[in-house]
Amino acid sequence: MPSRRKSPQFGHEMGAFTSARAREVLVALGQLAAAVVVAVGVAVVSLLAIARVEWPAFPSSNQLHALTTVGQVGCLAGLVGIGWLWRHGRFRRLARLGGLVLVSAFTVVTLGMPLGATKLYLFGISVDQQFRTEYLTRLTDTAALRDMTYIGLPPFYPPGWFWIGGRAAALTGTPAWEMFKPWAITSMAIAVAVALVLWWRMIRFEYALLVTVATAAVMLAYSSPEPYAAMITVLLPPMLVLTWSGLGARDRQGWAAVVGAGVFLGFAATWYTLLVAYGAFTVVLMALLLAGSRLQSGIKAAVDPLCRLAVVGAIAAAIGSTTWLPYLLRAARDPVSDTGSAQHYLPADGAALTFPMLQFSLLGAICLLGTLWLVMRARSSAPAGALAIGVLAVYLWSLLSMLATLARTTLLSFRLQPTLSVLLVAAGAFGFVEAVQALGKRGRGVIPMAAAIGLAGAIAFSQDIPDVLRPDLTIAYTDTDGYGQRGDRRPPGSEKYYPAIDAAIRRVTGKRRDRTVVLTADYSFLSYYPYWGFQGLTPHYANPLAQFDKRATQIDSWSGLSTADEFIAALDKLPWQPPTVFLMRHGAHNSYTLRLAQDVYPNQPNVRRYTVDLRTALFADPRFVVEDIGPFVLAIRKPQESA
């Protein structure tokens, strides 16, 4: 339950956030805004500086890793110095500014330096990063909320991160695929800086530095390939502490924290569905635990946390509706397909509980320390209570996800593993501080020794992050970018023909890209250019309103057609806007091929790839323009025929 006795490291409990005093709230908001500005400034300057140098590729040279380590050590040493300045009461405003600069710089150097010789982000333009880049491309082409692939549909996937990145790309005139890397790194730097402000509003500044850099390092190691999820992940620990204290406050106290919790959940609802669902689940658990513990004090006392929960929910729903309402209204009147739902995924990690505190590693050690601290302090410390409930919620969510397989779905619990690690590492940082304080009473030399051990551990973990991310970094260098180049300077792949394909489509159709529907199995083409797709990458990322399974059936049926007349008649009868551009590959026996996907959950892998062969005779007609471009076959239905 909320703290009755403060633990040593939990100084001015909850600061402005649990107080409704307007001045303190305004100060807190000002500091949050300053954190965003500082993070953006640091990221932009740093990334521009890195981009000015022609670096060797990360997979074939250790230079970028070496420079990453130097930058990380400099940032961590600087944070130690800033903590020392603060502890001795010197230059405190400058110390806060320096803290924001250095945690932002730590984030940028950890990812920006290893990616310095490529324009692509982690995992390049492959698999999941294809659809993410496609979404960013769509929302660069238009500020309207639209589906990433299907014409005329509202978005199902939360657009928040992609919309802001798209607006930045449009404002600067940068291709969306090229904006992905700087926006990903900048957005995570923003999240880390905001997390620092949230922590220093609740605990002593030097401890806030420690908790922030520890959680940031784990986030960068295990969540950074999905940058919008990483942002929510690093903000979850301070927001859970804030929410726990707000729900547990009495009388007129804590309402600023309640509002803050609602705003955070609403923001998360526009950012990442799974984490807002987990966050809401955790907040409900908090409210129920508080209500149950207060039953002996009367109904009014027990109902108060539930009323606060209702306020949190109302605020979150109001904010979340800005992006979810168009989809919900459309889904209320149009058929929705659950075939290929995003929840149809059960890897081995989702079939077992994970216990990072039992790993024989540096991460395992800090997680074990955090676990012990949670057990000891959960009832006496608000941070411990909040983080403990967050950890328990992950395990409960995982068990519910396993049970959900009986209903032929899952809750994607394996994606909460980075969240679990971040929560335990935050607890471990608190436990480390408390252990040092307890041992420090026995001698003055304990604190310098602990500082040295902590700094060494932070450097050891941080310098290993590029190795943790090495597979994703390698793909960022081996994939071909939108300019037809690879980061490792080796011969590019077939994507180098995309500019010629784009030029041919625009020449024949005479239309803007956002007026053309393309059927292709080379989905990275849609990641680089904002054409609409007739069919998505996989059923799991397809908008349920798009009826992926029915579209797949229609495409498969075309393999049985023999003439162009039959094919054009079939296209014109489609219940959706038909494709006018077909980007295919050559097949055997006078055919063109498309390699498509089918949902086969609960099997693993959960997607089966299959090939659809279309006879060349379907396109051997004056109503089509057919052209070979590299390994591709581009067939375009002439505008007067598709009108």
Curated annotation (Swiss-Prot):
Lineage top rank: taxon: Bacteria
The entry's keywords: Cell membrane, Cell wall biogenesis/degradation, Glycosyltransferase, Membrane, Transferase, Transmembrane, Transmembrane helix
Localization, UniProt: Cell membrane
One GO location term (cellular component): peptidoglycan-based cell wall
Keyword match Endoplasmic reticulum: no
Entry similarity comment: Belongs to the glycosyltransferase 85 family.
Protein name: Galactan 5-O-arabinofuranosyltransferase
The encoding gene: aftA
